[in-house]
Amino acid sequence: PALGRIYLPTGSYEEMMEWALPYDARVDYEAALERIKGLELWERAASFLKGGFWRNFLVKYPESNHLHKRMLQLSKKIEGFGEDGRDPPLGTSLQREGCALPAEGVRERAREELYRSQCNDVYWHGIFGGLYLPHLRHAAYMHLIRGESLIDSSSHREAPWVEYRWEDLDGDGLHDLVATTPCLGLFFDLDQGASLVEIDYRPREINLVNTMTRRPEAYHSKIREGKRKNPSPTEGVKTIHEMEPVQDQVGLEDFLYYDWYRRACLLDHFLGADAGLVSFGRCQYAEWGDFVNQKYDLKVEEKRGGELQLIFRREGHIWFPSGPAPVSVEKKIHLRGDSAPLVVHYCVQGLQPFAIQTIFGTEFNLNLLGESPPERYYEIDGARPENPWMGSWGESSGVEEVVLKNEAIGIFIRLRFDLPAKLWRFPIYTVSQSESGFEKVYQGSSLFPHWDLSLGPREKWNLRMQIEIGEPKDSLGKR
C-alpha cells in the first residue's frame, strides 16, 4: 500500500531555479545563500530556499517570451489548419539533410518543424550560452518560419496576398499586430513604441531582428571585480554548476552597457544637441521624448489589390529642460503582397504654441548572422565606408541610402530616405556566461538615421523611407 499522500511542488534542480530569478532577486538570493551557509542551520534550511520557477525566464527575457509565444502560435495554426492536411502547391518541397521530404501532408510536415523549434536550450540561459547565442535563436526561428510558410502556401493558392492579425501575441494583456505576405512577416509591439520586433524574410527563413537587449546579469559583478578562481587541489571535484568561469578575455568590462528599452526596429527617438554616437551607442544619453517604449494607437486600412496601410500614431511630449512640449508622431507603413519594398511615411507635428528644436530619428537593430569581414559589410550611398564591417562604429552625414549585406548567406537590407540623414551605426554586444568562461557575443548592428527638426506652432515634418529586403541577384545595386 501507499505510504501516504504527496503533492510535488513545481520546481527544478537548485541551479536552474536560481538562474530563473530576475537580476535584483538573484543578487539578493546569492547574498542570502552566502550568509546562511555560514550558519549551523544551513543543512536544515537549504531545502526551503527554492529560488524561482522556470517560466520566470519568459519574464526575465522578453526575447525568450517572444520566441515561446511564436512557437505556441504555430502550434495553434497547425491545429486550426484542418484535418485534410492538404499538400502544398506543386513544386514545393521541404529540404532535410540535402533530400526532399515526401509530401506526407502539410500538417505533418509543419508539425515536424514545430517540434524542431522546441529545442529547449534557446529558451533560457544558465551556465551555458543558451538564449544569448544568435545561431540557436536563428535555428528556432528558421523552423518556425518554415512551418508557417508550409501552412500559408497551402492556404493561399493565389499570390500575392496580405493578411493581418490584431491580438495579444506576447501574453501581456495588450493587443499587438502581425502582418504577413508570401515574402514577409512583420510583428509590431504597440505598447512598446509600435516597434517592429520581428522581420521575417520568408524566402530565406530568417528573422532579421534577431537581437538581444543588453541587460545586467548577476555574474557581471565578477567581471568588474576581475575575479579569477582556480580550483584548489584540496577542494575536490566540482560539478559544472559549481565551477567559476575564468575571465580569459581582457577588457570585457568595457562592454557592460545596459539598455532601458528592448532592441527592435522603428523606435522613435527625440534627442538633445549634446547626444552623440558613443553616448547613444552605450545607452548613456538623455532621451527627450516619451515614444520609445510607450503605447501607440493603430488603424488598419485595407486597399484594393490586397494591400494594407498600417497607421501608428501617438500624441506625447518632448521633455525639454525648460518644460514639456506636446508633439505627435505618426508612421504609416504600406505593405503589398508582392516583393515590393516596405514604404514608411513619418509625420511629426508640433502641437505646442511655440517653436521647438530637437533631433528626431528612428532606430533599427538588425542581425544578418555575423559581424566579420569580408562577407558582411555596409554600403553607404553606393560605396563602402572606411570601416565597413558590421562590428564597426561610424558616423556619416548626408546619407540617402544604407545597405547591410551578407554575401555568405546571400541577403541584403536597404534603407532609403527622401531626406538626407545623419547616420550613426554601432554593434550590439552582450557579455554572457558559458561553459568555457565569459564571452562577448555579437547580437546585431544598430543603425540610427536622424534629422535636425525645427518646428513652428502646429507645423508638420514629413519623411518617406523605403525598406527593401532581398537577395543580391534581385536588385542590389539598382538605383
Model-identified regions with their sequence ranges:
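Short beta-strand micro-motifs enriched in acidic
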Residues: D189-D191, H334-D338
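Beta-strand-rich recognition/accessory modules
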Residues: D168, C283-E330, D338-H345, L351-Q352, ...
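Polysaccharide-binding surfaces and accessory modules of carbohydrate-active proteins
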Residues: A340-P341, Q349-K422
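Hydrophobic, well-ordered secondary-structure elements that form the walls
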Residues: L114, C183, Y346, R458
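Acidic-aromatic substrate-binding/catalytic surfaces of carbohydrate-active enzymes
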Residues: P182-K299, H317
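Short strand-coil-strand connectors
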Residues: T180-P182, R202, K405-I409
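A cross-taxon signal for low-complexity, glycine/charged-rich
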Residues: R86, G91, R96-E97, E104-G105
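Active-site and substrate-binding clefts of carbohydrate-active enzymes
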Residues: P1-G85, P102, V106-L177, L184-L186, ...
